[in-house]
Amino acid sequence: MKVTQIKELVNSSLKEVNGTSEVLKEDLSNVVDIGKDLANNDDIDNFVKKLVDRVGKTVFNNRLYQGSAPSVLMDAWEFGSIVEKVDADLPNVEENDSWNLQDGKSYDQDIFYQPKVSAKFFNSKITFDIPMSFTKMQVKSAFNSATELNSFLSMLMTKVQNAATVNLDGLIMKTINNFTAQVVHANKGLQTINLLSLYNDTTGENLTSAKALTNPAFIKFANLTINSYRDRIAKMSTLFNAGGVNKFTPLANQHLVVLSDFASASKVYLEAETYNQDNVKISNYDSVPYWQGTGTKYGFNDISKIDVAIKDGATTTEVVQTGILGVLFDTNALGVSCQNPRTTTAVNARAEFYTNFNKYDAMYYNDLNENFIVFMVADKAK
């Protein structure tokens, strides 16, 4: 079983989402199976070398971070590694001979009709570790009570949990982004919907992507189109997956994720001035503030952009796309399975500290034979 270490990817992803880096190319080909600084002060503790001795009151930043990525977590298991997805083709229809009887004709009932069954296997994991060391004796001089010391240690553990949450959020988004990139790269008919081009062709307007989210008429058209495709993928079709497989996705199994700027624009420019809001809005969706990162300015071109390297047969291909407003997919199209968070502890008796190794591994997968649609706004090339 292939297990990929992703320390560098996880660390660079944090810079993309906290505004300290532009949106950079991410290689997902091995991830998704398809105040003031304290300086020059001698009165500091001997543990983290940052805490001032004998402070009257210390306030700890112990705020727990709540993740915002869409939930695509599947079940977990202890033994075995491979995920197997089994499917079968639709059987062909034959004539009903009960209503076509002829004198003296033989009707053969002993024909074997073999089911056309297919299976896909997913057998790769990613893994990372967040280590942090703790001590008590060496840092006691920085606090006035055991309560303060425990609050400090609690803050450190919360920081570890927050780091895990933000990085797992990023990995979930990478799972979605990898599928999005696969669809954009394949450029197959009804899997990639340029809402802006459709709107301009339908209305005769010449709207640009820069103005689209402030145009109520466009937003109404976009909501109409998205709702139409939700009805369409509920019916059996081969048009909405890369494998050309007969698939249908009932509303209960649909997962719609939209850019929060688009969702907010719909509420402000459209729903706020509409009496019958249910007739014009999209519903039952998750929203995300960006797909891959914020850039340094949180501009639309950054938050609506993906720049990833994906598997393309035996090679990798870079896919760059801006203007992505949303994705609609079957709940079986992608997910996170066999997740295994755990903590191991090592005690160093000589130096009197202990280290927690917070480990996580899981399977991140895309099934390109499931329904997946990308909605975007892209200006026509000049």
Regions found by a protein language model. Name each.
Residues M1-Q5, G35-K50, T147, S151, ...:
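Alpha-helix boundary/N-cap detector
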Residues M1-Y65, Q277-K382:
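Extended, compositionally biased alpha-helical segments that mediate assembly or anchoring
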Residues V31-D43, N100, G104-S106, V183-N194, ...:
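Mature, Sec-exported extracytoplasmic domains of Gram-positive
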Residues V48-M132:
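Assembly/oligomerization interface modules of large self-assembling protein complexes
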Residues D103-Y107, V160, R230:
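A structural signal for well-ordered alpha-helices, especially hydrophobic packing surfaces
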Residues S118-G189, E352-N358:
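Long, contiguous amphipathic alpha-helices that act as assembly "spine/axial" helices in icosahedral shell
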Residues K159, G170-L224:
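Loop-centered beta-sheet repeat module
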Residues L207-G335:
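Extended oligomerization regions of viral-like shell subunits
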